[in-house]
């Protein structure tokens, strides 16, 4: 028995040597044969064996709605886009906003969408398209009641798809983006402010009238005992502004009473006469102090009056006979003498 087994083993070893020689003949330079393993397919097997569910973007009766991906409510429509727009895009957006505003307002004014929406009397403040035309924001005016605002918002969101379908059927735009109704916060703030002013307490009617009258009281009226006038100096650049303001107020009061015209005419006549007198007195005179201070104080006027009756001196060239007769007298360096002639 053992002899037979040893013979079989020897024959099997011979077969192995034969196969090796054959492989060496078929593949010269290759001492070993091809080797295959199932390890390379272990990743594929692991993927098929996993029990994770595939995410679908649609609802199916077999899968159910629980496996459908549900993004946050209006997240992709309300997010702000950072894409820069050109000047031409802004002009196009303004035109489309006006077109959509008119179309949506017409739909809200008719029961074509729904009778419930028509009964709510919703008013739109503006319509704004996003720069990438992914959504159409319609801002509607709110009311003072929070419950009514919530009901209106629910009805508007429910009717948004139907309104979009009507706009596309009317060919307002070729592709109308999804419509999103948003509460106008500015209008809500104004409504709240009006409500607060309506319930505000401004005091009795008489006190309010007195308050208004005190605001427009006469500036010359005596001040109450408890008040004090400002102690700051009203003089600037040598001008008393307080006195000047009093003169102006006095002139205004006289003008209102009908006396200002006469006073003004008298002042103008007085100024004209003074100017004429000044022109007559403007004659060549000797060198004297002609400063503004002396003129204003009246010193030059007195000098002019003294010079009116004084003799006038003039220079002339004497004859040769007079020069010989007056050789003994004083001469001027240039051969000219001065004489006085009284007119």
From Swiss-Prot:
GO CC list: mitochondrion
Region described as Disordered: 214-234, 275-343
UniProt feature, compositional bias: Basic and acidic residues: 325-343
Bias kind Polar residues: ranges: 225-234
GO BP of this protein: rRNA processing
PROSITE patterns: RBFA (PS01319)
Cell compartments where the protein resides: Mitochondrion
Presequence range in chain numbering: 1-41
Keywords: Mitochondrion, rRNA processing, Transit peptide
The keyword rRNA processing is annotated on this UniProt entry: yes
PANTHER family: RIBOSOME-BINDING FACTOR A, MITOCHONDRIAL-RELATED
Family from the record: Belongs to the RbfA family.
Name assigned to this protein: Putative ribosome-binding factor A, mitochondrial
